[in-house]
């Protein structure tokens, strides 16, 4: 409820940034490990889902450097382990956190208006089972964002405003689903350690490039036939209408003189106005 109310309150008069970590407070993962007794793996899993919530919410997502590769530290003066040197060697294909951020940022970039301006409505969820699904809608486009904080995958039914039989795609994993007769989509939200995220969108149907419209072909054939019948006549007409070289020179001279006359008239008018002033 809080996030839905926040979403409704934010508009283009606000410059609101949401962040999980900063230079003067404990990092998100570090705070879970040191304050709540999470293991490193548990904190990493929670951070993945938190990043999904952050990057799919209205507002400006602020990523504290290193967060995207799994770095975190404490605001423990004078050591300040939250102000670490950036470790670029962690930005690899094998780094789950890094790939998670790349995937989410790519999706947010593709649907900027939906995430920056869209409405937010909770459509499914369970505190006990640890998952939540919200719809983000703007300009005729609706995305369904599912998040799972548990260490096991969740099979859930997501109510959608789409017709039965419509194909939907999970932008996060690439998996496709079909809307059931009850206008729900049965999806699997992965465990938190695997990203804990699904982002569903309708698959728009496009025209089969292998099929052609017969009407344009028929029209083209008719035009070609007409062109063959009248080709000789058109050639003769063109020859008759073609001007002689002398006519070309006269026409060019006339256009040139007309242009000079217009310039002279404009200049005279300008001088007259200045004289009157």
Place the predicted regions along the sequence by residue:
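Conserved alpha/beta catalytic core and glycan-binding cleft of carbohydrate-active enzymes
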Residues: 1-77, 119, 127, 148-149
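Aromatic- and carboxylate-lined catalytic core of secreted/periplasmic carbohydrate-active enzymes
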Residues: 85-127
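Carbohydrate-binding surface patches
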Residues: 123-162, 201
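C-terminal beta-strand-rich structural cap/linker in extracellular carbohydrate-active enzymes
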Residues: 141-143, 180-216, 224
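Solvent-exposed beta-hairpin/edge-strand motifs
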Residues: 160-174
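C-terminal low-complexity, Ser/Thr- and acidic/Pro-rich disordered "stalk" regions positioned immediately N-terminal
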Residues: 207-248
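Juxtamembrane/start-of-transmembrane alpha-helix segments at the extracytoplasmic/lumenal side
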Residues: 245-257
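C-terminal membrane-anchoring or membrane-association module
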Residues: 262-277
């Amino acid at each position: 409820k809080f996030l839905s109310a926040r979403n409704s309150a934010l508009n283009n008069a606000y410059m609101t940034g949401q962040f999980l970590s900063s230079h003067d407070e404990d990092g998100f993962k570090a705070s879970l490990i040191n304050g709540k007794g999470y293991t490193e793996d548990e904190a990493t899993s929670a951070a993945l889902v938190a990043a999904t919530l952050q990057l799919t919410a209205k507002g400006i997502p602020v990523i504290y450097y290193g967060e995207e590769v799994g770095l975190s530290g404490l605001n423990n003066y004078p050591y300040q382990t939250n102000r670490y040197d950036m470790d670029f060697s962690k930005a690899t294909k094998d780094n789950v956190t890094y790939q998670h951020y790349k995937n989410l940022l790519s999706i947010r970039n593709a649907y900027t208006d939906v995430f920056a301006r869209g409405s937010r409505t909770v459509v499914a969820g369970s505190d006990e089972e640890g998952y939540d699904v919200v719809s983000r809608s703007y300009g005729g486009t609706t995305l369904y964002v599912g998040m799972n904080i548990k260490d096991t995958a969740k099979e859930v039914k997501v109510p959608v405003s789409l017709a039965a039989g419509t194909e939907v795609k999970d932008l996060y994993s690439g998996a496709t689903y079909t809307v059931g007769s009850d206008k729900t989509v049965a999806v699997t939200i992965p465990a938190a350690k695997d990203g804990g995220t699904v982002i569903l969108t309708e698959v728009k149907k496009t025209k089969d490039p292998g099929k052609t419209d017969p009407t344009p072909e028929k029209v083209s054939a008719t035009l070609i036939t007409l062109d063959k019948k009248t080709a000789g006549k058109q050639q003769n007409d063109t020859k008759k209408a073609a001007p002689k070289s002398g006519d070309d020179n006269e026409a060019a001279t006339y256009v040139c003189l007309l242009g000079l006359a217009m310039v002279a008239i404009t200049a005279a008018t300008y001088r007259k106005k200045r004289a009157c002033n």
